[in-house]
A protein has these predicted regions:
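Active-site groove signature of glycoside hydrolases
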Residues: 1-26, 152-156
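Substrate-binding cleft of secreted/luminal carbohydrate-active enzymes
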Residues: 77-78, 82-178
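Surface-exposed cleft-lining segments at the edges of enzyme active sites
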Residues: 17-30, 86-93
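Alpha-helical scaffolding segments of alpha/beta enzyme cores, especially the outer helices
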Residues: 31-45, 68, 72-75, 101-108, ...
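Short, hinge-like loop/turn segments at secondary-structure boundaries
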Residues: 24-25, 70-72, 99, 172-174
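Aromatic-lined carbohydrate-recognition surfaces of secreted/lumenal glycan-active proteins
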Residues: 7-11, 28-67, 112-123, 157-159
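Substrate-binding cleft/loops of secretory-pathway carbohydrate-active enzymes
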Residues: 51-89, 130-131
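A short acidic (Asp/Glu
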Residues: 18, 64-65, 166-168
């Protein structure tokens, strides 16, 4: 038994990346990318088979606010996981079309890394209640991303909320991304 993967969960600036660009040579995007490169080089030197992944903010302009450039990060990470939490309060207003578009945006921009869409297992209500989803509802969401986007997988957030469906075989007929 050993380590199969390492996930970088909060590899970003907290919405203020544009304030951390003291020169053309030193930028927020450069810092995040360099950290990915250093982690990649250190981990792959020990075990080239370890999967490296990172959670990314879902905004298309994540470079400006968070220092996350999927094109650059995708050179060093195996999987990019945009947090497409479209059932959550902050993103619900954007709707499903936005969510599917985010998955495609990251899949196109983040190559050669694969993209797994980060989806929630719960919904936020207008009264700030967190309501767990049943397995069928979560499966329906996952199926939409499998059938309608370039994403090659999903990540479900958050363990302990919602009923986890059987996702085995969901991507079996979808060609692997190159």
């Amino acid at each position: 038994m050993g380590v199969d993967g390492i996930h970088l969960d909060y590899i970003r600036f907290g919405g203020t990346a544009y304030k951390h660009n003291p020169s053309e040579e030193i930028t927020a995007v450069g810092c995040v990318t360099e950290f990915c490169r250093q982690i990649h080089d250190a981990v792959k030197a020990v075990n080239p088979g370890i999967v490296l992944s990172a959670a990314l903010m879902p905004e298309p302009d994540s470079e400006y606010y968070y220092g996350q450039d999927p094109a650059q990060m995708g050179q060093y990470l195996d999987i990019l996981m945009p947090m497409i939490y479209y059932h959550s309060e902050g993103y619900r207003k954007n709707g499903l079309k936005w969510a599917l578009g985010v998955a495609d945006h990251f899949a196109k921009k983040g190559s050669p890394a694969r993209v797994w869409a980060g989806l929630t297992t719960y919904e936020d209500t207008d009264t700030a209640q967190v309501v767990p989803m049943d397995a069928e509802r979560i499966l329906q969401d996952c199926r939409m991303f499998a059938d309608s986007t370039l994403a090659t997988g999903v990540v479900l957030f958050r363990y302990g909320l919602g009923e986890l469906p059987d996702l085995n075989g969901l991507w079996k007929d979808k060609p692997a991304a190159k």
